[in-house]
């Protein structure tokens, strides 16, 4: 099926190109999203008549996307999720999740603009792409953690393994301190016993 592109489409072509695509791809994606029209003589003629207007509109939306991209690109967003002690999520972080946290922070992002190359199924820092325009793409960082405190530690560069090791070391230190306190108290009791016995003998 032949269509004429109304904007640049990755791996297909530039605005105004007539390209061959699968009918399903055209009907389910290109046509309903206004990215292309069927390449009939009437549509091609209409495009040529509106080409200058379409190019101007595309340039305007590109500038808007670039302005947003300068603010959005490189931002880190916290996603709170339940996970096992080993850091495996009970579920996964989706493009909708990424769009939602960005929107909550004041950025207008739709889940259809987000691409996550590898499924996010573990705690930690993960990269997502945000395609703001056919020619404008930025990356954001998703800080997936079990709590805001954990997210803050991860943001400082500590991995889940390092955090777990620190927690284990802290727990072992507390146990060691507890045993030291118990041992010290026992020694004091043993030291007091002879003195008490001596006092008792003197009083007789």
UniProtKB/Swiss-Prot annotation:
Pfam families (alphabetical): Ribosomal_L9_C, Ribosomal_L9_N
Record's function text: Binds to the 23S rRNA.
GO biological process: translation
Cited Gene3D superfamilies: Ribosomal protein L9, C-terminal domain (3.10.430.100), Ribosomal protein L9, N-terminal domain (3.40.5.10)
A GO CC annotation given for this chain: ribonucleoprotein complex
Domain of life (superkingdom): Bacteria
Region of interest: Disordered: 180-204
Entry-linked SUPFAM superfamilies: L9 N-domain-like (SSF55658), Ribosomal protein L9 C-domain (SSF55653)
PROSITE patterns the UniProt entry points to: RIBOSOMAL_L9
Keywords in alphabetical order: Ribonucleoprotein, Ribosomal protein, RNA-binding, rRNA-binding
NCBIfam families: L9
Name of the protein this chain belongs to: Large ribosomal subunit protein bL9
Entry similarity comment: Belongs to the bacterial ribosomal protein bL9 family.
Acidic residues compositional bias, start-end: 187-204
GO molecular function, one term: structural constituent of ribosome
